[in-house]
Amino acid sequence: MKKFTCVQDIGDLKSALAESFEIKKDRFKYVELGRNKTLLMIFFNSSLRTRLSTQKAALNLGMNVIVLDINQGAWKLETERGVIMDGDKPEHLLEAIPVMGCYCDIIGVRSFARFENREYDYNEVIINQFIQHSGRPVFSMEAATRHPLQSFADLITIEEYKKTARPKVVMTWAPHPRPLPQAVPNSFAEWMNATDYEFVITHPEGYELDPKFVGNARVEYDQMKAFEGADFIYAKNWAAYTGDNYGQILSTDRNWTVGDRQMAVTNNAYFMHCLPVRRNMIVTDDVIESPQSIVIPEAANREISATVVLKRLLENLP
């Protein structure tokens, strides 16, 4: 594996899952693999789980780790070509990236959608510049359109908790006071569509995702109908994708908050969320604190997904 930005990069899912469960039994089995190798983690945006889990994964593999917060202590970076740099950004990403590549063996990048221009976001300009110019293997720690480390961990979690070979998995939109990127729902849909699960997406009209991520999923605008018989409920907010509404909040309808009313029609479903979660906006206290909430094991599996990804990138270093 030379990069990791989407489900296709991981290859065969059964093999990746088997490797995940192997590593979960012995997290330090490959501690010699990363000896004298350095991971550079670059954050354009805030992080808790991604930062901690990826750093822990690198340590599991014996790597050195450098963490760079672009907006705290580093030069402000210009990202557009052709710009006259007479403002407050003294360095261009096109010089910074190859310099960063000089100091490490693998690069992880976290850069959210800006919601200024959909084409810019969906062309993944930032992470693709790292792939093109760093001279190093690059993996996504969440980009504008996908969050594959999260989705891989979600898949591991579902495989651990499922009670039937083909569970019904429902991803539901839920309200939030701020417009959030589509990266997590896009990525979750992409990974679920790579399985044989029954996969349903439910949201209010106007919140349709990019069709290339929706794929063969059934889209249901009636949340209660979508929840019927579900084995897993994956809640997430996202801003509008379509047309002139890109990046906007179209609804804050609290009827979409996941609570006991919705969970009652499921097949005693497990509740999942990538975290951080806005309680009593996305989900009620009762649901997230219930025995069916698996958000903490889900978050713990971020270490496992990151370890598998880093291991595979290390194995393909020259």
Swiss-Prot record:
Taxonomy, superkingdom: Bacteria
GO biological process: arginine biosynthetic process via ornithine; citrulline biosynthetic process; L-arginine biosynthetic process
Enzyme class: transferase
Residues involved in carbamoyl phosphate binding: 47-50, 75, 110, 147-150, 274-275, 302
Pathway given in the UniProt record: Amino-acid biosynthesis; L-arginine biosynthesis
Any GO molecular function: ornithine carbamoyltransferase activity
Catalysed reactions, semicolon-separated: N(2)-succinyl-L-ornithine + carbamoyl phosphate = N(2)-succinyl-L-citrulline + phosphate + H(+)
UniProt KW Transferase keyword: yes
Binding-site residues for N(2)-succinyl-L-ornithine, renumbered to this chain: 142, 176, 236, 278
Gene deletion effect: Disruption of this gene results in mutants that require exogenous arginine for growth.
Known EC number: 2.1.3.11
SUPFAM superfamilies: Aspartate/ornithine carbamoyltransferase (SSF53671)
Keywords: Amino-acid biosynthesis, Arginine biosynthesis, Transferase
Record has Transferase as a keyword: yes
Residue(s) at site: Key residue in conferring substrate specificity for N-succinyl-L-ornithine versus N-acetyl-L-ornithine: 90
Family (UniProt): Belongs to the aspartate/ornithine carbamoyltransferase superfamily. SOTCase family.
Quaternary structure, from the entry: Homotrimer.
Function, in words: Catalyzes the transfer of the carbamoyl group from carbamoyl phosphate to the delta-amino group of N(2)-succinyl-L-ornithine to produce N(2)-succinyl-L-citrulline. Is essential for arginine biosynthesis. Has no activity with either L-ornithine or L-aspartate as substrate. Also has no detectable AOTCase activity, being unable to convert N(2)-acetyl-L-ornithine to N(2)-acetyl-L-citrulline.
Name of the protein described by the UniProt record: N-succinylornithine carbamoyltransferase
Natural source organism: Bacteroides fragilis (strain 638R)
Source organism phylogeny: Bacteria, Pseudomonadati, Bacteroidota, Bacteroidia, Bacteroidales
